[in-house]
Every structure is written in C-alpha cells, then in structure tokens.
Amino acid sequence: MNKEILAVVEAVSNEKSLPREKIFEALECALAIATKKKYDQEIDVRVKINRKNGNFETFRRWLVVNQVLQPTKEITLEAAKFEDVTVKVNDYIEDKMISVTFDRITTQTAKQVIVQKVREAERAMIVEQFRKYFGKILTGIVKKINRESITLDLGNNAEALILKEDMLPRENFRLGDRVRGVLYAIYPESRGAQLFVTRSKPEMLIELFKIEVPEIGEEIIEIKSAARDPGSRAKIAVKSNDKRVDAVGACVGMRGARVQAVSSELCGERIDIVLWDKNSAQFIINSMAPAEVSSIVLDEDRHTIDIAVDSNNLAQAIGRNGQNVRLASQLSGWEINVMTVDDLKLKHQEEKDKILNIFTKYLKIDQKISNILIDEGFSSIEELVYIPFNELLNINSITQELAYSIRESAKKALCAIELENKKVINERKLHKDLLNLKGMNQKLAFKLAKKNIFSLEDLAEQGIDDLIDIENLNSNTAGMLIMAARNICWFGNKTSA
C-alpha cells in the first residue's frame, strides 16, 4: 500500500503538473476525512505521510481552549498541561490512533477528496500563474460559444471567459478563432470561471496602443486617458515626455498604419487621438475634435463646462446620439454642456440676472455696483461675507465705506437666508434620514426643502430634470443622490445612507 501511495503521488503530479507536496497534502486530507467517517462522534484527525517511503500515521487531536464547547474536539488548557507543560491556547494535543484500512467506502471517500483537492490546487496554480498578466492582453483559442459568453483556451489547462458585455457589438466568433483581450478580473475562490477577459473596456484600447507604439513602452509617450463607445468610436489622450516627439503623430504612424492596426483589431472602431494638456480648458477643446469650439466657460466647483459652437457645427460637436460630447466628457472627466454661441450668451445672461436680483435684494446696492461685483467673479452672498476685506477694497469703484456697507449687508443677508431656511424646516420638518444621506449637506437640504422635498421618499420620486435648476447642483450629483435615495427606499439598501 505504501508503494501505491508514492506511485499515485508521482502519477498525479506528472499528469496535472502539480508539485508533489500538493498531492501529499491532498492525500493526507483525504485519509483524515475517511478516518473521521469511521466514528459516530465528531472528532478532529491529522494524517502524516512519510514523503520517502509512503508510510502514514494517524493522530486524533484536540484544540487547546480556555472554555470547552465541543468536548470531542477541544480540551482545556489546564487538562492539556498534564500532557505537555509547554502547551498554549490554540495549540493542539495529539494522540496516535489506528490508521484507517482501505475498504470500498474508504477508498471511494479518499478518491472524491483527492479529486477535489487536486482541482483546487490546479485552480490556485492558474490564478497564481496569470496574476502577473492582470491588465495585460492575453491571446486564446475559442473553445466554447454560447449566448452570454465565449470560453477561450489559454493553454496549460487555463481558460478565460469573455462575457457578452465585454465583446464588441456585432462581433462573431467561431470555434478555433484566435482572440485577444485584456485580463481585467481574477476570482481565486470562484467555482466557475476564474479569469475574465474584455475587448470592450478602455483598457483594451490602451494595451493595443502600447503594442503598436514602441514609444509608449519606452515612456517617451504617455497615455493619460481613454474613452470608448465599443465597436463604434473612441478617443485616447496622449502626452509626449520628449519635446522632439509628436505624440499624436507617433500614435497615428506612417500613413496611419499604427492607428489602423488598432482599429482593425476592434472591428473598425474609429479612433480620435487627442493631445493631452495640463490646462483643463485646452484639453477639453482638444477632446471635442473634430468640432471647432468658439468659447468655453468652466465651473471649477461643479466640475462642469459650457461649450459654445457655431450653430452649423452643433450637430458635429454633439455627435450621433451625443457620442462625441459623451466621449469627450469621459476622456476629460468633466461634465460638458454643448450649445450654440447665442444659447450660451442667453444662459449666462439668465444666471447673471439671477445673481443680480439676489445682490440688489439683499445687499441694498444699485445694479451698477452689482454688475461690478459679478464681473469680478462673485456669485453668492457667502463669498462676499468670507472674502478677505482687502480684496473688496481692491475692486475699482468700491470705496472703503461702500466695502464696509457691502460686507455688513452680506452678513445680515446671510442671517436672513438662514432664518428663511429654518422657517421652511419648521413649517414642515426635514427628515433626519435625508440629512444623513451620503453626499447630502445642510445647505443642499434647505434648497431641496424649498422644492417640497423633505424626506428620502420625496427625493426618490424625483428625476434629474426636477433638480437640475438648483444652484451648484450638477446632473451627476443629482443622479447620485436620487439613486442613493431609491436604493434605501425601494430596495432597502442601507449602505447608501
């Protein structure tokens, strides 16, 4: 029997390309489980196989604890010290026992455990083997095709899955096709597929350019960001770390060879190569190519930007189904609003009129002074309260007396606004759960209360269009707050609170 154990270990190790130690551990576990099944009581067993001659010994063991909860598997520290004075809590006390004899049931149990343990070891080895390829392009042969995914054979018993959402639209594969994709997820504990590959994520575009453009690997050119509408269009932002190298030209290649190679791999996806710029405004203008931008207005606080284009360029700037502006927004990380030059002027005039009315109402100043403050960049009462006084004095046409008057009026106005907000709350109290919502603050809650939104239930019923007119609230934040409220109210997800 001992020689048979060594023969089994050698055979399985060679067949599965697994270390002999892993097979020995699987056998020890299998023999321990088979031994436990011989007893009516639940006991703990350890089996030790001699790696040289195949002999094995079996030990019953007890865990050393302060308080015994399972008498058949645990022993108190005081009792354990009679066996070994050096023993500590969480150590084991062991007694040698009779090793199991290999009858039919024992053999069947051992076989099942060994198969399971070997499979687990194989999966662990595959995960370890491919961990270094995370985020890199893998090539595999199509092994299996179904509606929701395809399975790639990566060799050495390793397989990867490409889900439907990770494929390109209208992409068709046949058995035996060679397919490339980026490894983006590894699940070590998964019972099903462990390796997941994508062809639709921006990482695929980035990795293809790294292959086609040697300057990227040499770090002469740096890829800053990428955005994709998979299979249709993409934008990638690049920057040169060497003034002598044209980043865009290097990525395009001679007669467009490099970008064409990437496009061909992605089923003809049209790719715009954009020059990255540390100036956000210039980068966004570059991102909007091929549309020509007439003027832009950035809102740093809300991280939004209004872009004006000529009316005859509006369709091109927006793109089919908003594709161009959506990709530019993803590429730059800014929320971009595209409109005609006239619409932008009208929008900003409306915003200016709104601020003008607030200033004239609360600060008791004429329109001329209000316009001066607006032209200097002031857009709220709070800014006039907390700005250093010297900055007010430095504004043309603002005397010291007028500056004091504006500051005092602003302080009184701020108090009046707070009282007005408290009145709104007292008339119909704001719910605590709304105030505690992630991303919510008291100032925003007051503004919601003015729109008769006093609870999470009220907020969950709103749409983004209902909230977008609130000052300093962009569509992304509005959408995030609404979804958080819905998750709590409709789906009972308290983690959004």
Curated annotation (Swiss-Prot):
Mark the sequence repeats by their residue spans. Answer: 364-414, 439-489
Q: Which of UniProt's keywords are assigned here?
A: Cytoplasm, Repeat, RNA-binding, Transcription, Transcription antitermination, Transcription regulation, Transcription termination
Q: How does it assemble?
A: Monomer. Binds directly to the core enzyme of the DNA-dependent RNA polymerase and to nascent RNA.
Its recorded name reads Transcription termination/antitermination protein NusA
Entry-linked InterPro entries: DNA_repair_Rad51/TF_NusA_a-hlx, KH_dom, KH_dom-like_a/b, KH_dom_NusA-like, KH_sf_prok-type, NA-bd_OB-fold, NusA_bac, NusA_N_sf
- Organism the protein comes from: Buchnera aphidicola subsp. Baizongia pistaciae (strain Bp)
Family according to the record: Belongs to the NusA family.
Biological process terms from the Gene Ontology for this record are:
DNA-templated transcription termination; transcription antitermination
Q: Which stretches does the entry tag as region 2 X 51 AA approximate repeats?
A: 364-489
Q: According to its UniProt record, what is one Pfam family this protein matches?
A: NusA_N
Compartments in which it is found: Cytoplasm
Q: Which GO terms describe its cellular component?
A: cytosol
What does UniProt list as this organism's lineage?
Bacteria, Pseudomonadati, Pseudomonadota, Gammaproteobacteria, Enterobacterales
- Residues forming the KH domain are 302-372
Question: Where in this chain does the record put each S1 motif domain?
Answer: 135-200
* MF annotations from Gene Ontology: DNA-binding transcription factor activity; nucleotide binding; RNA binding
Q: What does this protein do?
A: Participates in both transcription termination and antitermination.
